[in-house]
C-alpha cells in the first residue's frame, strides 16, 4: 500500500520520535538535584550504588566497601555542580569510586589491614572470599567488569551504560576475565 498525499501531510515523520526523545533518567535526576531536589539524589543513589559497590569490591577489603560507598556519594552530592554533562553521571561517579579506591590503598599502606578470611567462618563465605581474592588478583581491566557481573548481577549492557565502556569492551573483558578466573580456579584446585 502506498501513502497518499493526505497521509504524508498528517502523519508524523519516522524521525520525529527520535527528535522528541526524552532525556535519560540520570539527566533528569541530576538536573532535579541541582535545582534542590534531594529525593532525586536518593534515586541516583539507588541507581548507581550497585555500580560503586562493585567497583570498590574489586579493589578494597569488603569491610571498607559500605563506608566508602557512602563517602563517594557524599562527595558526589557536594561536587555535582562540577559535572559538565548530566548524561555522564555514571562514568563520573565510577571514576570517583576508582580514585577513592586508589586513595584508600595509599593511606592503608602504613596500617595493618584486617584479614577478610578471619571474619567469615562459614564455608560458603570462605569460598566466596577465595574467589573474590582471585578476581582481585586479575588485571584491572577484567576485575571491575567481573565483580559488576558476578557479584552485583549487572548485565553486560548495564555495565557498559554505567561505566562508560563500550558494550564490546565489556564483552571482551568479561570473556577474558572469566577465562583467567577459570584457569586460576583450576590451578588452585589442582585441575
Where are these regions (language model features)?
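C-terminal edge and immediately downstream basic/flexible tail or linker adjoining helix-turn-helix-like DNA-binding
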Residues: 1-14, 32, 130-133, 161-164, ...
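A short, charge-rich alpha-helical start-of-domain segment used by transcription regulators
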Residues: 30-54, 131, 143
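Sigma70-family region 2
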Residues: 34-35, 58, 62, 71-88, ...
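Short, aromatic/basic-enriched loop-to-helix "N-cap" motif that marks the start
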Residues: 67, 81-95, 167
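Arg/Lys-rich amphipathic alpha helix in sigma70-family domain 2
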Residues: 78-85, 95-116, 124
